[in-house]
Design a protein with these regions (language model features):
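Solvent-exposed, conformationally flexible loop/turn segments
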Residues: 201-203, 328, 332-337
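A sequence/structural signal for flexible, mid-protein segments enriched
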Residues: 167, 171-270
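Short, low-hydrophobicity acidic/polar segments
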Residues: 87-212
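Beta-strand secondary-structure signal
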Residues: 33-39, 112-114, 207-209, 218-222, ...
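Tryptophan-paired
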Residues: 70-126, 232-332
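C-terminal motif of bacterial Sec signal peptides marking the signal peptidase cleavage site
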Residues: 16-19
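Acidic/polar, low-complexity intrinsically disordered N-terminal segments immediately downstream
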Residues: 21-145, 332-380
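Sec-dependent signal peptide recognition
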Residues: 4-10
Length: 380
């Protein structure tokens, strides 16, 4: 039996398929009744291309905002695609595991196997039909972002970068996805030969080894305000990253080419540093590429990435600003820390700024919310 190795990544998984003592022997059965146990280990140090522990300065409050890094998945879903003699998929069975254990009846023969965590209320899964690859995505919640003012960082000003006043951000806004981990084992053979199994405590056990890899990536964004003098006091509307992928094919790892904006909460801990904001955002990454493949990232469709930020002033008004973060996102396709230094004198509060509103349903950064419509098959 050949096990196909995957490139090592942050989350290593060991899958053991076992069941009760099998009678009659395996070779007399058409299916193998098994128990699946998923054991995982998370190593955040190698998930991001830079070490957030040394680059991240914002005083993040885990007890209020949750963890910065990845969490180990607590429940899993297993898709088994049975292959015919022609190598094409003929059947599709799905098994959900409470926690990390469950049972499965698998036909002897070749199968494509897909594992992913299923403990999210935000992630949705769709395919063209029951035998097609599955894409993960999130719902569209707004037709787009509201108008924002372009602002250069101190680094961009030093490089004499010209602010782009003409850019129009014309893309939908989606829910921010939760953490998603996937493992794909194509053309895997379930044998009827007992020699291919271990016999442990009265059970035949099949071990499947591989790496669960993140399919959504974490960016930590910190904004440092120069010449603030208590003018910027918070962000009621939060922020959004533009130009990110709408979803991902969990089999191939390729992100969808459709670009969307992903919103996030923004925090300001004034008792620690009144001149800094911090945010954490998850996304499927750069559209139209495999984020783990440098060549694929380099060949991805060109696009702009803006960090659109709502800032509240001590005058009781607010302003939406946008900062070009294309270079940072493209340099960190699997996530990382982005630090932005901006001068408040470049976007000071003005009499014409709209007043901060606390009205129900009002969002200063995005247009009215809307529900997604479509005809694709949604898999639950």
């Amino acid at each position: 039996m050949t096990l196909r190795r995957f490139i090592p990544a942050a989350l290593t998984a060991l899958v053991l398929l076992g069941g009760c003592t099998i009678e009659p022997p395996l070779h007399l059965r058409k299916t193998v009744a098994t128990k699946v146990v998923l054991q995982t280990r998370v190593s955040t140090d190698i998930l991001w291309q830079i070490n957030w522990q040394t680059q991240w300065d914002y005083a993040w409050q885990t007890e209020l905002y949750g963890p910065l890094g990845y969490s180990e998945p607590k429940s899993m879903r297993m898709h088994v695609y049975t292959l015919g003699d022609d190598g094409l998929r003929k059947a599709h069975n799905t098994y959900n595991f409470n926690g990390t254990e469950g049972t499965a009846d698998i036909f002897v023969g070749y199968h494509d196997m897909l594992f992913h965590n299923n403990n999210s209320e935000v992630l949705l899964f769709r395919s063209d039909d029951d035998l097609s690859d599955i894409n993960a995505y999130t719902r569209i919640i707004s037709s787009g972002l509201k108008t924002s003012m372009p602002v250069l960082t101190l680094e961009q000003k030093a490089m004499a970068t010209k602010a782009d006043d003409e850019t129009e951000i014309e893309e939908s806004v989606t829910f921010m996805p939760d953490e998603l981990f996937t493992l794909y084992k194509p053309n895997y053979y379930i044998s009827d030969n007992l020699d291919d199994y271990e016999y442990i405590d009265g059970k035949y056990v099949l071990r499947i080894q591989g790496e669960l890899r993140p399919a959504t990536f974490i960016w930590l964004i910190q904004v440092k305000f120069v010449n603030n003098y208590d003018r910027v006091i918070g962000s009621m509307g939060g922020a959004a990253i533009t130009g990110m992928s709408y979803g991902v094919n969990m089999t191939t790892g390729l992100t969808e080419e459709m670009a969307v904006s992903v919103p996030m909460d923004v925090h300001m801990n004034k008792s620690v540093d009144p001149d800094m904001m911090g945010a954490r955002v998850l996304s499927f990454g750069i559209p139209g590429c495999n984020p783990y493949d440098d060549a694929s990232v380099a060949a991805a469709p060109q696009g702009r990435h803006w960090f659109v930020l709502n800032v509240n002033f001590s005058t009781g008004t607010y302003k939406n600003i946008r900062i070009d973060v294309t270079d940072q996102i493209r340099a960190l396709p699997t996530g990382g820390v982005i630090t932005l230094e901006v001068d408040v004198d470049d976007f000071p509060p003005e009499i014409t700024d709209p007043p901060v509103s606390g009205g129900g349903g009002f969002n200063p950064i995005m247009n009215e919310w809307e529900e997604e419509v479509g005809s694709t098959t949604i898999i639950y």
